[in-house]
């Protein structure tokens, strides 16, 4: 329902679209803008612990800059404890290893039910800690969390091996066995959703998990940890550690008793994790990293739709999306009109209190990101891009940035090459389809891309030519738990979601048995 409402709202344009979205949000419960923080420790073996070091760190409300609370700071010693608990839970004969696959699915469904029960609280806590609009937390993020967990619950007893008719008097078959102890490191831009993306396939296939949550946004993941216990998962199956990348994250990536690591975050850190995994026990690695995704607007595109979708592609989630459409390529004969309309749309974007249902854009997640984005804006101006709107802070307090649009952007500019991760739109001009393919692919990234055209031949050609793990045609940011997501080149390795997402969490074992006589 939400996606249909959002698409209809986009087609109507900003003013009428907001009215439609406003009507849809009337069914959304009124949030508590100061939700109580119930859990701020480390979750190991279904119990809450202080850090071994007794250290804590503050988590901050990005709308105000005020400290929400202090959270236990896990590091190597805590990772060691969590891995030990996970390894014990994975031993042969343990309750988790002996559990029926269908029962694992039931537990995942139970977890989804508990999250749905506490949906209003979780959405409010996500908004408080992350800064994204509450209406997005409730209608988008939580909706996708529930669908992801329930999707993988259904796979628990359906992802299995095969019998193989090899020659001779033999019976041969394969088993899909869990990898073992899975280290999972999740980012701050979609804390609840990324937790679900990681937990769903890992638990459905019978693995155990040591998860490090982002230091900027630890609160919702810790609350879900308690729901995991309430759902009935055995002790040690899921362990959650708040902490910092160079300490807790590095300890997971280099741990000799961790069998796999899955990471979502920057390409820079992805390099470090790949190296640490290789230098330790050559653990399996799944990486979902950065992007600089091209969004190609052909001259025959539906102008109203393309403008609104390009705006959404860049500015959604305060621009803090790895797959954001951050290089908007527009064919030259519609360039001027597209730029004019895009600037008008950006100027109409509502920035403010994320708990206000009228707000489209909240603050950046923290001061570091705030300053980083402003630095990229400064770079764009210095390198000759034309600043058409925005360009500065949007409030005296908190980490709000004005919706910003640059025109006359050239491929060699810093803002056209590097991932900004903020509300900064770059619009580039192109002449021919062949030209734009070369320019779009001339990037170290390859996470996503989009094409807007009414010509099926152009859509097919471009979707095949673009070097990206996902290509959207006449839409953007359309996700489903059923469809895989991942990147080419420096945007990562492996896939999450869909049946493909299960492969990274299983080992395929061949068993061959000699029999007295084989019959067909």
Curated annotation (Swiss-Prot):
Keywords: Acetylation, Mitochondrion, NAD, Oxidoreductase, Transit peptide, Ubl conjugation. NAD(+) binds at residues 186-188, 212-215, 245, 265-270, 288, 419-421. In response to mitochondrial stress, the precursor protein is ubiquitinated by the SIFI complex in the cytoplasm before mitochondrial import, leading to its degradation. Within the SIFI complex, UBR4 initiates ubiquitin chain that are further elongated or branched by KCMF1. Its EC number is 1.2.1.3. Residues 1-21 form a transit peptide. Pathway: Alcohol metabolism; ethanol degradation; acetate from ethanol: step 2/2. Coiled coil: none annotated. It is found in: Mitochondrion matrix. A motif (SIFI-degron) lies at residues 13-27. One of its GO terms (molecular function) is aldehyde dehydrogenase (NAD+) activity. The record marks 189 as: Transition state stabilizer. SUPFAM superfamilies: ALDH-like. GO terms for biological process: aldehyde catabolic process; ethanol catabolic process; nitroglycerin metabolic process; regulation of dopamine biosynthetic process; regulation of serotonin biosynthetic process. Belongs to the aldehyde dehydrogenase family. Required for clearance of cellular formaldehyde, a cytotoxic and carcinogenic metabolite that induces DNA damage. Homotetramer. This is Aldehyde dehydrogenase, mitochondrial. The lineage of its organism: Eukaryota, Metazoa, Chordata, Craniata, Vertebrata.
